């Protein structure tokens, strides 16, 4: 069992990583006998895990209600969020309740925002079931829903009480979802840890085979890196923005193509190549390192170009609504070397458009 602490003073919390955690009531600390819980999950995961977790918690004396939502990025909306509020109010649940997010990034983000908002804030626990959510979205307290004009535009910073990562969940993960998660894994190597990137080059096949030791190390290293960044910059005023490598481009793809048509990791993968090409054009990143990124993404089964039907110009309106924009100026996360990156403003639009167009023709 691996345990990592996200250090935020009185709001610090553990990330527990192991196989078989769903069988142990202690995995869901700080829940205890007599507590009230609302389990939030989706239609895909409910048949796989809902009864198991409900049974484990009820055996420990926890009072469990649940709400099952439709599955998919397009349901990460204010309308579906209201379904959670209605379920909480109908029971009813008070300010001493705990929300448990059982699912991937959509369920985690939406449930976290529900917890941040319901009666001005209640406790919640992240139980991520996809690789992407295990290494990224469940850690750090970013919660949100989408708006038709932009991804994650309505939300809050709100930390969980704990994160429970059961490696066994990956056994039921579709191959496309596994690849999507690997995009965020690869991101950590590009922005923060060149040695980890090299480890990924050497061990990607083991990850694709879901080999336990390799996957446990991979998830632990990603969580360690993110925990360090969040502890230093919880509200994304500086360092934490580096975690958005590829996301400014990727969010444009998701919004333009319709949420869910491209998985988040797929869009981020293409976006990371666009960021690398932009950095190349600025003379601060080598073509050889861009090729290393492309090769690793392709081995993971990820796209390295944007949608053929989306013009370079179509990206700009979305990118100019990005949350990193300051005083109307686009700010991009750009790699400087494998393992080193920066946030840079003032990049001429023609350079960005040229990089996007180059990736469209890849």
UniProtKB/Swiss-Prot annotation:
Q: Which residues bind NAD(+)?
A: 71-76, 105-109, 129-130, 142, 151, 169-172
GO molecular function, a single term? nucleotide binding
What is the annotated localization of this protein?
A: Cytoplasm
Q: Which GO terms describe its cellular component?
A: cytoplasm
Assigned keywords, A-Z: Amino-acid biosynthesis, Aromatic amino acid biosynthesis, Cobalt, Cytoplasm, Lyase, Metal-binding, NAD, Nucleotide-binding, Zinc
* Residues engaged in binding Zn(2+): 184, 247, 264
Q: What does this protein do?
A: Catalyzes the conversion of 3-deoxy-D-arabino-heptulosonate 7-phosphate (DAHP) to dehydroquinate (DHQ).
The family line of this record is: Belongs to the sugar phosphate cyclases superfamily. Dehydroquinate synthase family.
Any keyword Nucleotide-binding? yes
The record's listing under CDD domains reads:
DHQS
Q: What is this protein called?
A: 3-dehydroquinate synthase
Q: Which InterPro entries match?
A: Dehydroquinate_synthase (IPR050071), DHQ_synth_AroB (IPR016037), DHQ_synth_fam (IPR030963), DHQS/DOIS_N (IPR030960), DHQS_C (IPR056179)
**Repeat found in the keyword field:** no
Catalytic reactions on record? 7-phospho-2-dehydro-3-deoxy-D-arabino-heptonate = 3-dehydroquinate + phosphate
Please give a single GO biological process term from the UniProt record: aromatic amino acid family biosynthetic process
Where does the protein principally reside? cytoplasm
Q: What is its EC number?
A: 4.2.3.4
- What pathway is this protein said to act in by its record? Metabolic intermediate biosynthesis; chorismate biosynthesis; chorismate from D-erythrose 4-phosphate and phosphoenolpyruvate: step 2/7
């Amino acid at each position: 069992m691996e345990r990592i602490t996200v250090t935020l003073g009185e709001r610090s919390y553990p990330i527990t990583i192991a196989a078989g955690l769903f069988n142990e009531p202690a995995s869901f600390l700080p829940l205890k006998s007599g507590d009230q819980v609302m389990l939030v999950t989706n239609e895909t995961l409910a048949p796989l895990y809902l009864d198991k977790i409900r049974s484990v918690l009820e055996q420990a004396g926890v009072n469990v209600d649940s709400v099952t939502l439709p599955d998919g990025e397009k349901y990460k909306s204010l309308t579906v969020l209201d379904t959670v509020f209605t379920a909480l109010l109908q029971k009813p649940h008070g300010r001493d309740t705990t929300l448990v997010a059982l699912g991937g990034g959509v369920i985690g983000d939406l449930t976290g925002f529900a917890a941040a908002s319901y009666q001005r804030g209640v406790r919640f626990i992240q139980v991520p079931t996809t690789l992407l959510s295990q290494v990224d979205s469940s850690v750090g307290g970013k919660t949100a829903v989408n708006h038709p004009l932009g991804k994650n535009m309505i939300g809050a910073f709100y930390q969980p009480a704990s994160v429970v990562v059961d490696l066994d969940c990956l056994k039921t993960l579709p191959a496309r979802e596994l690849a999507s998660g690997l995009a965020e894994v690869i991101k950590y190597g590009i922005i923060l840890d060149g040695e980890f990137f090299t480890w990924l080059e050497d061990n990607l096949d083991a990850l694709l085979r879901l080999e336990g030791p390799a996957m446990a190390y991979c998830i632990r290293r990603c969580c360690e890196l993110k925990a360090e960044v969040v502890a230093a910059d919880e509200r994304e005023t500086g360092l934490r923005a580096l975690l958005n490598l590829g996301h400014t481009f990727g969010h444009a793809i998701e919004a333009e193509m319709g949420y869910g048509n491209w998985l988040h990791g797929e869009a981020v993968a293409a976006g990371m190549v666009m960021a690398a090409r932009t950095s190349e054009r600025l003379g601060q990143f080598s073509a050889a390192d861009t090729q290393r990124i492309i090769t690793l993404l392709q081995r993971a089964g990820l796209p390295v170009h944007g949608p053929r039907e989306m013009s370079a110009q179509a990206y700009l309106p979305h990118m100019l609504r990005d949350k990193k924009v300051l005083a109307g100026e686009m700010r991009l996360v750009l790699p400087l070397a494998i393992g080193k990156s920066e946030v840079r403003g003032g990049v001429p639009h023609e350079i960005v458009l040229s990089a996007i167009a180059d990736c469209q023709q890849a």
